[in-house]
UniProtKB/Swiss-Prot annotation:
Pfam family name, one: ACDH-11_C
InterPro entries: ACDH-11_C, Acyl-CoA_dehydrogenase-like, Acyl-CoA_Oxase/DH_mid-dom, AcylCo_DH-like_C, AcylCo_DH/oxidase_C, AcylCoA_DH/oxidase_NM_dom_sf, AidB, AidB_N
Effect the entry attributes to changing G158R: In n5661; suppresses the defects in egg-laying and response to reoxygenation of paqr-2 mutants
EC number: 1.3.99.-
UniProt-recorded name of the protein: Acyl-CoA dehydrogenase family member 11
Function: Promotes adaption to elevated temperatures by regulating expression of the lipid desaturase, fat-7. Binds selectively and with high affinity to fatty acids with chain lengths from C10 to C12 and prevents them from activating fat-7 expression mediated by the nuclear hormone receptor nhr-49, leading to low levels of membrane lipid desaturation and membrane fluidity for adaption to heat.
Entry superkingdom: Eukaryota
């Protein structure tokens, strides 16, 4: 009996252990194989850039170059160690708006993440705005320094670069109107907008867009100003697209209402106003935040519709000169827009280049497959051309602010600003898309952060004037009193004058630019003569003209850079040759100018458009 009892107990114990073991094995890690991909690494964007350092070395005096290079190198380390993470978090923790508190009180509380606030603090600490206005530094140097720093910052900035653009534009506007030291609010605003102290620094908004339209400022403005006393007014209107609504001050346009309740229409009726967004108690200044915009990209950035119902503002500048007053702002923000475009282009190339050394496909890394490196090389060539165009704009802006511009340089600044903005914006979207393709399916995955670059880049051809709007602005530049076409030719010839013609590739590059320039000049002169007879519509080819100017100018800059043996290397020569000789610098034909072609365009576009008869088209 004793043996039988032991046997029963052993059998029972064995059964229990089996049950425990069976239950235990229900829990184990999934077997997914040992392979995982290695993502791209963001290196110091200053040290990692193939052309930025050489460009600055050429443009700046040696002592200034050393100072600027040290600052940018240090900032590049901060971008990789801190800024990039903050910008990513701003995308993941997007702003939201609470209209009412729990008790039904209207509060219009804008909630942004801590990372957004930290990024704004970093902008002040790093002097992102103040660098452009430091009295102790030559304006020529400081603008180049500022643009370089913004270029490094922009793709990691979590769209804080947008309020920085508007802040820079506001400082430029207020100082250009000679208000500093003469106007209390303007003086305080300038000091705070360019402050390096995060506890004192302000940011500015610009509220120009209304329901009737964006770029048509004169026709679209439906905001009215009722005078309280000499220069103080109450504003009433609806601002349709207002970015960075957590700003401290804003510049806006409005129509002054006279004593009879009438307001002048058109651009002559617009005046410029400066207002604080909140009063001393922190309450909104006669402003209601109606809603945050649901945008394709730039989701980190709080963009709102605003109802102005008695917002107290101060008129700055002469009455009826509002459009002229914002011209300086637009020049600055358009350069910032180009910085953003090129920042996205450079970032996607840098990440794709790094990834190509890690991703193994068909037995070797992407970097060893000729087709892949050819793709990246084409992207690099186009980016370098526009990068030099950007720093040409920075150089010209600095010379203008220093009062050192020649007549040709002054005209080139007016021409290059819209050309740079529209061309870089038009390049950015397809290039970032191409770069995302370099990552295969991973480029399409939201949690890699790569799609954010594409969505955010899409705004750059739209903000501060679409491609078509700015192309028409380029035509207005040519229709002015100055002979811009002649000045453009002189600048290109000046750049080509240093060409190392003993180098066959540079010689051919120079010939290609000269040929394209002559063709453009011939076509524009011919079109101007025929336009009197109504045979041509030069406006229909405005974007082709603008693109051609961008390519010719960029090509000449690349040749000039590659001919400087003190900084250039063999890749600079190859880039200049590929840019100028392996792709068309001019994409323009005489038959495209014909008035009859416009009629044919309409027939193509509205073929079988059933709503045509009911529309006003």
């Amino acid at each position: 009996m004793h043996r039988i009892g032991n046997a029963v107990r052993m059998a029972s114990s064995s059964s229990a252990n089996a049950t425990i073991t069976a239950r235990h094995t229900q829990y184990s890690h999934a077997k997914t194989g040992g392979f995982s991909q290695t993502g791209p690494t963001l290196h110091n964007p200053y040290k990692d850039d193939p052309i930025l350092d050489r460009t600055l070395r050429r443009l700046l005096p040696e002592s200034e170059y050393m100072r600027v290079a040290a600052d940018l190198s240090k900032f590049g380390d901060r971008i990789t160690s801190e800024v990039e993470h903050l910008g990513r978090q701003a995308e993941l923790e997007q702003p939201r708006l609470e209209h009412q508190d729990a008790w039904g009180k209207r509060v219009d509380k804008l909630i942004v993440c801590n990372e957004w606030h930290k990024l704004k603090q970093i902008c002040a600490e790093e002097g992102v705005i103040s660098i452009g206005y430091e009295d102790s530094v030559d304006p020529f140097v400081r603008r180049i320094h500022q643009v370089a720093k913004l270029f490094l910052f922009s793709p990691s900035a979590g769209l804080v670069s947008c309020p920085m653009a508007m802040t820079d534009g506001a400082v430029k506007t207020l100082t250009s109107l000679n208000l500093y030291g003469k106007h209390k609010l303007a003086t305080e605003a300038v000091d705070r907008l360019r402050s390096r102290d995060p506890s004192k620094a302000w940011t500015s908004g610009q509220w120009m867009t209304e329901k009737k339209g964006g770029s048509d400022v004169a026709g679209g403005c439906d905001t009215y100003a009722v005078q309280i006393d000499k220069d103080t007014y109450r504003l009433h209107g609806y601002k349709w697209f207002s970015s960075a609504v957590d700003a401290d001050v804003a510049l806006t346009l409005a129509r002054i209402v006279d004593s009879d309740g009438n307001a002048l229409e058109g651009s002559r009726g617009l005046s410029l106003f400066l207002l604080k967004i909140r009063d001393e108690s922190g309450n909104l200044n006669g402003i209601q935040m109606v809603r945050l915009k649901n945008k394709l990209g730039t989701k980190q950035l709080p963009t709102a519709e605003l109802l102005l119902d008695g917002a107290i503002a101060e008129r700055i500048g002469d009455q009826g000169r509002g459009v002229a007053g914002i011209s300086n702002m637009l020049n600055i923000t358009r350069i910032h827009n180009a910085v953003a475009s090129l920042g996205y282009m450079r970032r996607i190339i840098s990440l794709a280049r790094d990834y190509s050394t890690k991703r193994v496909v068909f037995g070797q890394t992407q970097s060893k497959w000729p087709l892949h490196t050819t793709t990246l090389a084409k992207m690099e060539v186009d980016t370098r051309g526009s990068m030099l165009l950007l720093f040409e704009a920075a150089r010209l802006l600095g010379l203008s602010e220093a009062g050192k511009s020649s007549d040709v340089e002054a005209m080139m600044l007016r021409l290059i600003t819209p050309v740079l903005k529209l061309y870089a914006g038009k390049q950015a979207v397809p290039m970032v898309s191409e770069g995302i393709e370099c990552f295969g399916g991973q480029g399409y995955m939201e949690d890699t952060g790569l799609p954010t670059l594409l969505r955010d880049a899409q705004v750059t051809p739209i903000w501060e004037g679409t491609t078509n709007v700015l192309s028409l602005d380029v035509l207005r530049v040519f229709s002015g009193k100055e002979n811009i076409l002649l000045a453009f030719g002189k600048r290109v010839e000046q750049l080509l004058g240093n060409t190392k013609t003993e180098d066959e590739k540079l010689k051919k590059s120079k010939e290609a630019v000269e040929s394209a320039l002559k063709q453009l000049q011939k076509l524009l002169v011919k079109a101007s003569d025929s336009a009197i007879q109504g045979e041509t519509r030069i406006d229909s080819v405005a974007r082709h003209i603008a693109f051609t100017i961008a390519r010719i100018y960029s090509g000449a800059l690349l040749i000039d850079h590659a001919s400087d043996s003190s900084v250039a290397n063999q890749s600079d020569i190859e880039v200049a040759y590929r840019y100028c000789c392996e792709q068309p610098l001019i994409d323009l034909r005489w038959e495209w100018f014909a008035s009859e072609r416009v009629k044919a365009d309409r027939e193509i576009v509205f073929d079988n458009f059933t709503a045509l008869e009911k529309s006003k088209i």
